[in-house]
Every structure is written in C-alpha cells, then in structure tokens.
Amino acid sequence: MLSSRTSSIILILAILVAIMAVAQCRNIQYDVEEMTPEAAFRYAQWGEIPHKRVPSAGDMMVRFGKRSI
C-alpha cells in the first residue's frame, strides 16, 4: 500500500502534468491559411470537392409522397 504522503505527491504531480498539458495546448500556433472561415468547415487538402446539398423538408415530402391536408 502507498502511504498517504506518497499518494499525495503522486496526485500533485498528476495535477501539474495536467496543467502543463492544457497550457501547452493553448499555445499552439496556427498558420494564417488555417484561420480563414473556410478552414472551419473543411480541410485545405480536400480542395473544391462538390458536396451534396442537404434536402429540405419539402424535398423529402415530395420524395416520399407526403401531401399537406
């Protein structure tokens, strides 16, 4: 069994490692190209791949034969 002192030292070290990991993640430098609004939605290497549009509710009703009453 670990003594109380040893377990508290391990806990303190784990907390310090977690704080350092969070601080390191927050300091990541991004390229200027990645800060464009388009970068939030797709990666640059995808290029201009034509994406399917999402069908509207009206399109789905026509497709499945639903009629308004």
From Swiss-Prot:
Q: What span is annotated as the signal peptide, if there is one?
A: 1-25
Q: Where in the cell is it found?
A: Secreted
Which ranges form a coiled coil? none
Heme among keywords: no
- Propeptide found at 26-51, 68-69
Enumerate the UniProt keywords alphabetically. Answer: Amidation, Cleavage on pair of basic residues, Neuropeptide, Secreted, Signal
Residues annotated as carrying Phenylalanine amide in the record are 64
Q: What domain of life does the native source organism fall in? A: Eukaryota
One GO cellular component term: extracellular region
One biological process GO term for this chain? neuropeptide signaling pathway
Q: Which family does it belong to?
A: Belongs to the FARP (FMRFamide related peptide) family.
Q: What does this protein do?
A: Probable FMRFamide-like neuropeptides. Plays a role in behaviors associated with a sleep-like state induced by stress (SIS), acting in concert with the FMRFamide related peptide flp-13 and neuropeptide-like protein nlp-8.
Indicate what this protein is called per its UniProt record.
FMRFamide-like neuropeptides 24
Q: Which organism is the protein's source?
A: Caenorhabditis elegans
